[in-house]
């Protein structure tokens, strides 16, 4: 059944708590999906910033183009072209991260009270954004295999939804990657029913294969796929640079997007352009991907060992570094979250990934940090709590 609810705003206070905890340095961070500083190419970033400042022009220190610096837009266009995705620099709008990009385009394409379709479980930040913008959320179920395209077509055809918000490559929290056939079909459905698909492709460069998967945008013929992303997950969460790509068919929205966009830090834009042109970013990705795969596999092995004797479901992501854990229904993820906080561990309870409590016995873990002794101890502590809970309910 399709689910239409509006109770996400009731969780806003809890979302604020989640964001507060993810910045505390004294916690074991298994919650927010972010790379370990050890995986960030700090020296390459420093060199790029120095070169960008050295070769900058006087006009680079004035208010810059709201669309983003031309050098960065050109660099991104050429970078994507190497992976088979062709987007012109003039169609790229630089934003201060992926969430601002999503917010911009949602406000341009839809109005307060419009319904947005989201496959769930879905990144809680997206759901929070939709709720804060007073858009209604219509959920269709996603699984480790991807999205039910028959259900997606049924909703598009019904005319109930104004747009869809989805991730095709290494979705958070499930980690699936849709096939090229499925992506092409989504683009065709969007055109057939004139329903915009806002594609969040933030994890595309975090796959376990060296070849980057193509986004839905690749098959877009009529401009109904709006492509968004950033380098927050592939480079550094502190590097607040993202984009939204508006095709020629959407030029009527251009003025609204530009007026709503905050000017992004110019030196950082130039530094990212330098990182791309110097090949340092490509080298970083080639190094990052196998390390992520190894790291995620280590987490999976340790989690299965720690929870031995407990019937759990554990995601098998093809990329990214989110892990989605399902426990027996007696286990309450929110209760586990509070237990973890009391013991200096940060996790994310499953119920914030959908509008009702169907994911209450799930949690999401971050595998972006190396599997340290401290993290192993934290996983052991969670496993011990789960086993005690199950023993008490059985007795």
Model-derived regions, located:
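N-terminal helix-turn-helix DNA-binding module of bacterial transcription factors
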Residues: 1-2
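Conserved core segment of the aminotransferase class I/II
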Residues: 45, 221-290
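N-terminal small-domain helix-loop-helix segment of the aminotransferase-like
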Residues: 5-97, 277, 346, 389, ...
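Conserved PLP-binding active-site segment of the aspartate aminotransferase-like
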Residues: 246, 324-329, 347-385
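Conserved glycine-rich beta-strand-loop-beta hairpin in the small C-terminal domain of fold type I
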Residues: 289-300, 312-326, 336
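Conserved core of the PLP fold type I
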Residues: 56-193, 198, 204-222, 390-394
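Pyridoxal 5′-phosphate
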Residues: 30, 160, 304
